[in-house]
Amino acid sequence: NPSDGLRVEKNPNYWRAGYPKLDAITWRPVVENSTRVAMALTGEADYAFPLPSEQVKMVKDKGALRVDVTPSIMLRFVEMNLTKPVFKDVRVRQALNYAVNKEALVKVAFAGYADVAEGIAPLSVDYAVKLGPWPYDPQKAKALLKEAGYPNGFEVELWSGYNHTTASKIIQFLQQQLAQVGVKVRVRT
């Protein structure tokens, strides 16, 4: 069963003598953040990723594990389906960008252990271009929606391929932020 995890074993015919150093590795998906941390702290797991941002300080303070906080090549974003009529208008897409307080999102969902994206690739990636942040401006978002013909907002479906705790926080935050400018978000996972 794929949800039980994946076990890979050492290839006895590996081209480099003495490698790999491990006989086997087992990856197990652990959706709930606290469970993943507990498994690492008790030794049930040797590695936990992602380490829940809200628990980084506690794990560091315990001193039982090494916690590396480094720039990431991961980027979280919301993609809009431009084949949907509502998203064909650039003003709607801009409005949604203005409607989300990304600095607050970093604090709420990542306990400050993230950076607001300023381009289509993380700035830690070579040759990434910094496009600059979109400021949080819900009034401008409302004005753009009105100009685009949505003075009362609209309803949209958000699909998420992630169901872990941090993703849930992000989705809830986005629902709240977008609701403030009249956009009702239904979530599908």
Give the ranges of each region predicted by the language model.
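Short, well-ordered beta-strand elements
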Residues: 5-7, 22-29, 153-163, 186
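A bilobed periplasmic-binding-protein/Venus flytrap-type ligand-binding module shared by bacterial periplasmic
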Residues: 9-15, 70-95, 99
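Ligand-site clamp/hinge motif
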Residues: 11-58, 175, 184-186
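Immediate post-signal peptide segment of exported/extracytoplasmic ligand-binding proteins
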Residues: 18-23, 90, 138-157
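Second-shell loop/turn segments in exported
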Residues: 26, 81-85, 92-95, 126-134, ...
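Ligand-binding "clamshell"
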Residues: 57-69
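Periplasmic-binding protein-like
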Residues: 58, 83, 87-124, 169-170
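Structural transition elements
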Residues: 115-147, 164-169
